Structures are given as structure tokens and as C-alpha cells.
Amino acid sequence: MSTAMNFGSKSFQPRPPDKGSFPLDHFGECKSFKEKFMKCLRDNNFENALCRNESKEYLECRMERQLMAQEPLEKLGFGDLIDGKSDKN
């Protein structure tokens, strides 16, 4: 007796992400920014709100090197940091 089940001819069709791909940084072009961001997270008990500047710099690096799609910083939630303003005092 066969134990294989056939649920019809429908198969899973993968769908690309809405924002496009997020390629790996194989050449370490943004490694220093990533490490600075991760250090900030560790130093601040993983409270990401305290590391927004580091996060912004990391994403800017990725966009400049075509490692992610170009997006306005306002759309990524960094509108208040564009003019050098920061919640960190």
C-alpha cells in the first residue's frame, strides 16, 4: 500500500518579497557599520530605539552599494534623523 499522498497538481509558488531582495554583503562592504550597530544593541540591552543613528548609517551603506533597494529615509522611519536631529540627548 502506498503511503504517498497526492493533494492534486497545485504546488507552492514562491513569491518575491514586497521590497525586493536583500542580498548578503559577501564582500563585507558594510561590515563596519553592521558591527557598530550590533555593538550599540549589545551595549544598550538590545533596545533598538537607542541605536537609530547606527541603524540609519548601516542602511545608507547598503543602499549606496546597491545591497538593498533605494528608499527615502523618511519611508524607513528616519525622517527625524535626516537633519542631524536625534532623540538621543
Curated annotation (Swiss-Prot):
The answer to whether the entry has keyword Ribonucleoprotein is no
Q: Which UniProt keywords apply?
A: Acetylation, Cytoplasm, Disulfide bond, Mitochondrion
Report domain CHCH positions: 27-69
**Where are the N-acetylserine residues found in this chain?**
S2
Where would you find this protein in the cell?
Cytoplasm, Cytosol; Mitochondrion intermembrane space; Mitochondrion
Query: Which GO terms of type biological process are on file?
Result: intracellular copper ion homeostasis; mitochondrial cytochrome c oxidase assembly
Got any disulfides in this one, which pairs?
C30-C61, C40-C51
For this protein, the record's Pfam families field holds: CHCH (PF06747)
Give start-end ranges for motif Cx9C motif 1: 30-40
Protein's UniProt keywords contain Disulfide bond: yes
Membrane-spanning segments: none
Main location per UniProt?
cytoplasm
Q: Where is the composition biased (Polar residues)?
A: 1-12
- Region spans: Disordered: 1-23
Q: Where is this motif: Cx9C motif 2?
A: 51-61
Q: What does this protein do?
A: Required for the transduction of an SCO1-dependent redox signal from the mitochondrion to ATP7A to regulate cellular copper homeostasis. May be required for the assembly of mitochondrial cytochrome c oxidase.
Q: Which family does it belong to?
A: Belongs to the COX19 family.
Q: How does it assemble?
A: Interacts with CHCHD4/MIA40 forming transient intermolecular disulfide bridges.
Protein name in the entry: Cytochrome c oxidase assembly protein COX19
Which species is this record about? Bos taurus
Native organism taxonomy: Eukaryota, Metazoa, Chordata, Craniata, Vertebrata
